[in-house]
Amino acid sequence: XXXXXXXXXXXDGHCIPALGFGTYKPIEVPKSKAMEAANLAIGVGYRHIDTAYAYQIEEEIGQAIQSNIKAGIVKREDMFITTKLWCTCFQPELVRPSLEKXXXKLQLEHVDLFIMHYPVPMKAGDNDFPLDEQGKLLLDTVDFCATWEALEKXXDAGLVKSIGVSNFNMRQLERILNKPGLKYKPVCNQVECHVYNNQSKLLDYCKSKDIVLVAFGALGTQRYKEWVDQDSPVLLNDPVLCGGAKXXXRSPALIALRYLVQRGVVPLAQSFYESEMKENLQVFEFQLSPEDMKILDGLNKNFRYLPAQFFADHPEYPFSEE
């Protein structure tokens, strides 16, 4: 099944497959299940796999990739693998070691895309969420522009093909784009994006700068208890979305993904079920009419399932503005 042939061209000449597979797993899901999911995803045709240091799953994802390469299902060059730099590793001298560690866990010579997970530097050390005695986050004063220069060096060293950011607002993107001596601009900004938060302003801005907007939470997240308010609306139960799905004889998930793809967004779809994985790949097989798109635009309420409240006191907290 050679699916997901559609790709978005990035500013540096590389291509990003237009639908990705997300690998975040809630605490209650065992790592073996996440590895099995990644294995299935590659088997049914996903070539773009998105992971991160913070998901604590890179080794399992690496095993899934390797087993598919060994079985002759894919070649390394057909795969597009993203991982992310965690916020406690923003000191420039920590960037390359972090990238090398990630590549070793993933069993890869290089990753295709390495991105800053949040624009929020935190104190380096063994703790991923370093707190003081009062339970306040320990921040780091390093400027993420200095971190960016270290990402550029890793690209020059051949450890990564493309570099980008995640959860940056427009002002923060501007700071990198206007940085003196900028060598490579971010190829993407990965943010929460779905029909309830369609990011239209940020998307227009990113398009104007030739930055691909990658969407996590494209289906309204898996509503993991540790991060998502359980009273938040269930996106895939939205009556308008479900009505549109009925009319187009597709599932609500496919309509939600197609809405993003049609706007030039690269969605990450997450699932532990093979039937859903296969179905989500059908996003390239149909189109929504301009009327349908307008109706879906009307669902936007700038709602975040993942407001990253744990960073709310940080001076770089990205979500107080667009």
UniProtKB/Swiss-Prot annotation:
It comes from Mesocricetus auratus (Golden hamster). The keyword Oxidoreductase applies. The record marks 84 as: Lowers pKa of active site Tyr. The keyword Transport does not apply. This is Aldo-keto reductase family 1 member C13. Catalyzes the dehydrogenation of morphine to morphinone. The enzyme also exhibits significant activity for a variety of cyclic and alicyclic alcohols. In addition to xenobiotics, the enzyme catalyzes the dehydrogenation of 17-beta-hydroxysteroids with much higher affinities than morphine. Uses both NAD and NADP, but the activity is much greater with NAD than with NADP. Strongly inhibited by sulfhydryl reagents and ketamine, but not by pyrazole, barbital and indomethacine. It comes from the Eukaryota. Keywords: Alkaloid metabolism, NAD, NADP, Oxidoreductase. It holds the Pfam family Aldo_ket_red.
